[in-house]
Amino acid sequence: MMMASVMQAAEKLDLKSITSGAFSASYVTGINPIEGTDLYASISSDGKQVVSYSFKTGKQVAVLFDVEAAKAPMKSVEGYVMSPDGKKMLVFTKSKAVYRRSFKAEYFIYDIARKTIKKLSEGENQQVATWSPDSRHIAFVKDNNIFVTDGEKEVQVTKDGKFNEVINGIPDWVYEEEFAFNRAFAWNADGTSLGWIRFDESHVKTYSLQLFEGAKPTRSEFHDYPGEYSYKYPKAGQDNSKVSLWSYDMKTGKTLALDVPVDVDGYYPRIKTTPDANSLIVYTMNRHQDDMRLYSVNPFTGKSKQLIQESVPKFIKEEVMENSIVGKKNILLPSDRDGYMHLYLYDMNGKLIRQVEKGNYDVTAIYGMDEKTGDIYFQAAMLNAHDRQVYVAHKNGKVERLTSQEGSNSAYFSGDYRYFVNNWSNYSHPYVYTVRNNKGKVIKTLEDNKKLLEKTKQYNWGKRETFTFTTSEGVKLDGWMVKPVDFDASKKYPVILFQYSGPGSQQVLNSWSTGSMGSGGAFDYYLAQEGFIVACVDGRGTGARGAEFEKCTYLRLGDLESKDQVETALYMGSLPYVDKGNIGIWGWSYGGFNTLMSMSEGRPVFKAGVAVAPPTCYRFYDTVYTERYMRTPQENEEGYKVNPIERADKQHGALLICHGLADDNVHPQNTFEYSEALVQADKDFKELWYTNRNHGISGGNTRNHLLRQITNWFKDKMK
């Protein structure tokens, strides 16, 4: 009786609230450790100030920038970059996304002591503005060209940049998307030279997206006739950009071609500063992405020498480049060469000093190395695959855990490595930010999201239960499920499986970010409120279980992943409280691909499914991602035939496909071609298109509408 009255008093979740951010957590934003100090800077919650805080006390030290006090021509600051000497900062506003990681913005130079502000450059907004190590100059990209300025005089370094032809200092689309970076230049140690990657994409084939007037935002230029956005997108097996390396001498104003060996069709996925003014570090990768090399190149002579070669079976993960560190004395490189992702320490000449730590677990992030003490700070899935803790590895080989609570922990370390800001969460608790010393002791709580936690208790916010089962092939898989709040084990419930399933990904992770649409999995709890059990299982190919588990899908994407989702449906159907005739599946992007693969696997276990923005044949996807896991279509014809289009005649269950017409990542072509295959196979299905929306399908009321269609589809077909 009491339980019933409590449940009746609980407020009901609604999609409008979920998609409008009513359950969004509070963050400590823009955390930026100030180099060589125990201070960090952060943007205030109203975006009006950049404030410095003490790691030691957690207290505010100074206001570094104030929009009103500086009389800055902006409503709020969206981001900032401190100069290395701490005397100035770049602040930017009016940022506008280009692709996933890139943006253009209006940058300003602010002198902290003098409280003066000036525009970085006139004309087109700028990208990736970066201080020189001596704090005297700033390099940035505008209109595909590199510029440098001292705040008074601006020099244009390159002049051949042109949209869809030549790019200087920023990556092309596929490099940005798949090698995960947005700046392709680096200063040398004393700021006397600048090195960069030049992309000649003139011969790369173009893909065009059709644009309409639409709404929110309205594109009035397309009021009567649609327009197009055309850009260079290399598909699997096709030509990539031709890349070359260059340097600019700040004293002479001369440019020089740098000679760093790379295959004709290979990659330059990183360029980095070193402590030696006569050296930049350049990474190279072969097209198969199973051989990576680090070179030291002299920006004044153009000559290079190889330092490190990393070769592993099948492929090198992109995270190896993202997490590697070039320090003052050492280079730290992650590698799964022994079957798990671990850390390897080299000297600046490329000589291996030691393996930093070892065990049957994966290192998942690197936070830095204190070269004074030899301590190395990192994140790892050491307790289990769905847990993340922060650790320190000492020079003597001892590894200590610095975070205390199970769940997901990440860190931002101070410039002197004496303190860090810890961000912790788990399935049921939103983010908690605490300041800790480098022994792990909590000094102060910065944000605990108590208000959000209390709010979730006012709604039908269920509990995410974890489970493990073994497939008919003997594979042990981990999952979670959310049951209706009024769950009755004597009843039978329909089930919706959510999954992503892509290489190295994880959805079964003890974190507030886990769940189909973020916000603590609010959409999952909404579906549970509507009477469904929502479940998720990470199948073969997903991350944090070692190289063998992750790389077993190599050359046949979608084969094992779809089998594991079918096995998940069979397992769920065996539970006494599940209606095995009413099991559905859905996913976004790779999850959409695997939804289609699972619904055509051959065992008709799914009553309904929804595929959002799905790749339907990897010949249509980009070179870097696809070939990393599949090689080229010319080399792996049979592997590429493992796709939803080829098995459209096996598709079963009620199918809804949703796609944005302006998706620059997974092109609408994928859904167009798949729907034609379904038509010819005489299969019923429904399509839903979103005008001018990209891969994220958001803007205005779009996300609310999309989630309502997904919900209603499962309600109509399964209840």
Which stretches of residues belong to each language-model region?
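Predominantly five- to eight-bladed beta-propeller fold
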Residues: 15, 21, 58-59, 94-99, ...
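Blade-loop segments of beta-propeller domains
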Residues: 59-86, 91, 96, 122-127, ...
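Serine-hydrolase catalytic core recognition
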Residues: 18, 277, 410-719
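Beta-strand C-termini and the immediately following turn/loop, strongest in propeller blades
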Residues: 41-47, 54, 82, 89-101, ...
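Non-catalytic accessory segments flanking enzyme active sites
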Residues: 28-32, 43-52, 62-64, 78-79, ...
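Asp-box/WD-like beta-propeller blade repeats and closely related beta-sheet repeat scaffolds
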Residues: 101-148, 153-184
